[in-house]
Amino acid sequence: MDYKTSGVDIKAGREFVSEIKQSVESTYSSNVLEGIGGFGGLFKIPLEGLKKPVLVSGTDGVGTKLELAQIKNFHFEVGIDLVAMCMNDIITTGAKPLFFLDYIATGKLEKNQLLEVINGIAHSCRENKCSILGGETAEMPGFYSKNKYDLAGFCVGIADEEKLINGKKICENDLIIALQSNGMHSNGFSLVRKIIENNNQIDKQFEKKYNLDFYDELLKPTKIYFKIVNQILSQNIQIKGMSHITGGGIPENLPRCMSSDFIPYIDKKSWKIPVLFEFLKDVGQIPEKDFWNTFNLGVGFCLIIDKKYKDKILNICNAFDISSWVLGKVLKKNNSKENNFLPEIII
């Protein structure tokens, strides 16, 4: 028995690398010294304008959204998701992304599917001036089924230590600005899949009620917020804290960008929760607490700012065609009786 008979096709792997080369290299900046094909990617660190350069790294995956995406052939979109989940995390520090690496594991290398994934990754990296420096595609027969793949991403950026955004300058009554999500993003899908499993006509119910395709809405790719954050910072507007709203929703993620002395006060009347979330809540009979702790509810990213910058930031967001609004404000913890946002689950 040879390796191919056991389920690993080395030749197909080589051909796959050759086919993705053009897409990957389209993301390269002049700082890439050696990328795809070598044992290690080489990247020249751009230090211009940085007094105390700091590298910022993040890693993430797409979670069980992949299960539905693979069934419905949303392969390009999950490539975008992979970059977004990593990049949105590192930019909360004020970092600019430099390079990205990916890991793909599959039971059998289905070339057309994975080419779409890589094209989605490359598209997002080009859009945000981030080079794909390397990656790994592992064919693992018997460990994964033939029609399944899993993804992991790794993003590295750079910031100036003196300008790091770490929440230390947050004060009472600072404003919380919400940036709209592009639907579900990449969290809560284990619950969603269970709801679908228990309601086999759910897509038809949704389409009849809202005249929208259920899976098109459900599997929209995660929005990447780097461009808008970078534009705000380039206008000498101080952002005191940022939060990427992922697993755990607003209650878990928003407090992470501020010290334990403060608590976020959220005005739940400041926005209308998108219909997809409300529909899932009703069909799945999701308890209120789980609803808030599972989904982003239309809020993909948050900024903590001094109120004097409010109008400038809202105008910049509008120019980027991103809906934004004042979600709430920061309170001292001992003054949290005013809280209108599920106070029993705020940290």
UniProtKB/Swiss-Prot annotation:
GO cellular component annotations of the record: cytosol
ATP-binding as UniProt keyword: yes
Coarse class of the protein's main subcellular location: cytoplasm
Substrates-to-products reaction catalysed: 2-formamido-N(1)-(5-O-phospho-beta-D-ribosyl)acetamidine + ATP = 5-amino-1-(5-phospho-beta-D-ribosyl)imidazole + ADP + phosphate + H(+)
Xref: Gene3D superfamilies: PurM-like C-terminal domain, PurM-like, N-terminal domain
Gene Ontology MF, one: phosphoribosylamine-glycine ligase activity
Transmembrane region(s): none
Taxonomic superkingdom: Bacteria
Annotated localization: Cytoplasm
UniProt keyword terms in alphabetical order: ATP-binding, Cytoplasm, Ligase, Nucleotide-binding, Purine biosynthesis
Pathway entry: Purine metabolism; IMP biosynthesis via de novo pathway; 5-amino-1-(5-phospho-D-ribosyl)imidazole from N(2)-formyl-N(1)-(5-phospho-D-ribosyl)glycinamide: step 2/2
InterPro entries: PurM-like_C_dom (IPR010918), PurM-like_C_sf (IPR036676), PurM-like_N (IPR016188), PurM-like_N_sf (IPR036921), PurM_cligase (IPR004733)
EC numbers: 6.3.3.1
Family the UniProt entry places it in: Belongs to the AIR synthase family.
HAMAP family membership: AIRS
Protein name from the UniProt record: Phosphoribosylformylglycinamidine cyclo-ligase
Organism: Prochlorococcus marinus subsp. pastoris (strain CCMP1986 / NIES-2087 / MED4)
Lineage: Bacteria, Bacillati, Cyanobacteriota, Cyanophyceae, Synechococcales
